[in-house]
Amino acid sequence: MKQSGPAMYARTLGRIVVRSHAVWIVTGALAVLFGAFLLYSMRTGFIVETFQMALDSVHQSQIRNSDAPEYIQEEERLVASQLQDVVNSFGTKDFAASMATYYRTVADIVQTAFEEGRVDETADSILQNEGTAQLYEKVAQLANPVFYDDSTRFPLTYYTLYMLTQLPFFAWYIPLIIILGIYIHERENAKLLSHVPVSQPVLIFNLFLALFTASLACVLVAWLPAALWTLLNNGFGDPSYPVMFVTNGELFSLTVGEALLKWIAVFVGELALLSLIAAVCLSLNIGKAAQTAVVLLLALPFIPNYLSGTVPQFLLKYLPSTFLDEARITGIPGGAVTIIDSGPGCTFSAGMTTISGWCIAVILLALCACTAVGFMRIARLRRQHA
């Protein structure tokens, strides 16, 4: 059966990507990044020596503070007792409960000392202590309360979120830049966009679909080896495992499952927007401008003080570049509650609204450009036949 012009063109776009050595090299490099912490063990602090050192430190503090007020000595005795329970219960089913009790005790002591003016803590630090206590309390309530102390033992869901938020965000957009560069090269060599048997809107749609699906496929293929290894060796994991983080003066609590879904949603939205911008530029024969625009957008978050002064604060949540680093929205899994600077009002819902709005704006601009190109072609034909 003879294929239509759009179908043949879409097939050509796909064939160009599959046959490109650069695409496979980038995909392989991303696969190595995904599997890095399966090969190189990252310890998270859940080892008995860590808590034994903390206990020794408290004992030394008790000796130094032997003449301190009674309430200080009582606080140190309580902390020492809780730490001793943690050390004694290490490796048993009571370990999670002991950890939760210890961190709750620390959070309450610090909160009281802060209210009484005995410690110089920031509001975020107080929230961080409270978040740590809640994190361990939530873990203790799980059906299987475990602490992941070694990256080589992370289950699939936890490892995936850990790697997605630990590695530089721009790594996941490199395939798009490479594929866009390949299409630009093909256009300049008169192999791709010359005598295209499709209309301008169909051309944009085909280019968008090719850029978006190929880039997404590269990331998925790169993820698969590490995903299969962790699934077979460490299991799927508990999607309800907690993730806590502090941002904009608020304490946020998510599960690993929720955080993964939010990361994927923001990433897919950003990738779609960048692919759309690139497709429109390519269709208008300004491919190099497309590549420059994508690179500049990815580079914006690296501007010094991007979130704290360089860009007006009220504009941040309306810029898609603000949400490129998905970890600012999902938090970073681990035994410590992270303090994340994400910009005022830069939440998941705000990010999805901003990305959707920009996608709609680019589509409208593309329609206007297509209409203008159509009118110019009609005018040129009329002049030729005049």
Please tell me what each predicted stretch does.
Residues P312-G343:
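Short hydrophobic, aromatic-rich alpha-helical segments embedded in or entering the lipid bilayer
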Residues S41, L282-L319:
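Transmembrane helix segments
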Residues A22-L38, L274, G331-A386:
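Alpha-helical transmembrane segments of multi-pass membrane transporters/translocases
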Residues H59-L156:
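Long, solvent-exposed extracytoplasmic domains/loops
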Residues L33-S61, K138-I184, F205-S283, T338-G357:
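Secretory targeting signals
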Residues L30-F34, L211, L297-P301:
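Residue-level recognition of pore/gate-forming positions within transmembrane alpha-helices
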Residues M1-V26:
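Aromatic- and glycine-rich beta-strand/loop motifs that create alpha-glucan
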Residues S194-P201:
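Short helix-to-coil transition segments within interhelical loops
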